[in-house]
């Protein structure tokens, strides 16, 4: 099993933590990670685009002129697509772009991105992130003590609200729970800052 250093909030190394090789030590599957990232990005699209077809455009209920005898082409409505101000043919309608991938694929993608961060030495383990109250300055001190000055994803245990509130005003810092972190979140981060309890949760969820 791989070992990573375990730090406290002051940046002091206090111990080490063993990581499960089946989760943090596999050969990353880039193809699967790519598929999951595309899927998650598709799910983020709003899909609220809409145009009016001939039935939705106001007016046009009356036949503009009689069928025969005028010498002009026959017309049934001034809201037909060929008319100026008429309806749009085959235009976009509100829809969801999201689609689901098999659970095994999503789990393999998570294991792959976690393993990649560990292999690249971009996985920082911390004993805990406890704050008496939400304080942005206190969280900034923790990041400074751990020499983290890049885009970071902080993974905390469920119920650690003060950590999330303390970090939300800091640029380039995202906080998520270990059970809900997505592949897209992890890929977008330069480093992972993970609490000891969060590591246990990750291993419990993915094992």
From Swiss-Prot:
One of its GO terms (cellular component) is ribonucleoprotein complex. Residues 49-78 are annotated as: Disordered. The keyword Ribosomal protein applies. Keywords: Ribonucleoprotein, Ribosomal protein, RNA-binding, rRNA-binding. GO terms for biological process: translation. GO terms for molecular function: rRNA binding; structural constituent of ribosome. Pfam families: Ribosomal_L4. Belongs to the universal ribosomal protein uL4 family. HAMAP family: Ribosomal_uL4_B (MF_01328_B). Part of the 50S ribosomal subunit. One of the primary rRNA binding proteins, this protein initially binds near the 5'-end of the 23S rRNA. It is important during the early stages of 50S assembly. It makes multiple contacts with different domains of the 23S rRNA in the assembled 50S subunit and ribosome. Forms part of the polypeptide exit tunnel. This is Large ribosomal subunit protein uL4. The lineage of its organism: Bacteria, Bacillati, Bacillota, Bacilli, Lactobacillales.
